[in-house]
Curated annotation (Swiss-Prot):
Binds double-stranded DNA tightly but without sequence specificity. Involved in DNA compaction. One of its GO terms (molecular function) is double-stranded DNA binding. The keyword Glycoprotein does not apply. This is DNA/RNA-binding protein Alba 1. Keywords: Acetylation, Chromosome, Cytoplasm, DNA condensation, DNA-binding. It comes from Sulfurisphaera tokodaii (strain DSM 16993 / JCM 10545 / NBRC 100140 / 7) (Sulfolobus tokodaii). It is found in: Cytoplasm; Chromosome. Its main location: cytoplasm. Belongs to the histone-like Alba family. Acetylated. Acetylation at Lys-17 decreases DNA-binding affinity. One of its GO terms (biological process) is chromosome condensation. Coiled coil: none annotated. The modification N6-acetyllysine is found at residue 17.
């Protein structure tokens, strides 16, 4: 399996196996640095953590200051080490500061 590492844009938070609060802190840090819009991305089992991250930022830390701009869902074909292909669900949630 060959992996090509593509650089992640500076306004993207990739959600994975860490605790949800790590991703909340990353999102809050980006917003406090002056980034007006950030994208929370996840796939597979981490999708629920991505949704939790957005909801915690929106409701607990920055109520009435953040809005969900766009939600994109899809799937990716992933090839395992033994050559089998499977589909993995993906989500991208774009949030931004209210004007």
């Amino acid at each position: 399996m060959s992996s090509t590492a593509t650089p992640t844009p500076s306004n993207v938070v990739l959600v994975g196996k860490k605790p949800v609060m790590n991703y909340v802190l990353a999102a809050l840090t980006l917003l406090n640095q002056g980034v007006s819009e950030i994208i929370i991305k996840a796939r597979g089992r981490a999708i629920s953590k991505a949704v939790d991250t957005v909801e915690i930022v929106r409701n607990r830390f920055l109520p009435d200051k953040i809005e969900v701009k766009e939600i994109r869902i899809g799937s990716q074909v992933v090839t395992s080490q033994d050559g089998r292909q499977s589909r993995v669900s993906t989500i991208e949630i774009a949030i931004r500061k209210k004007a």
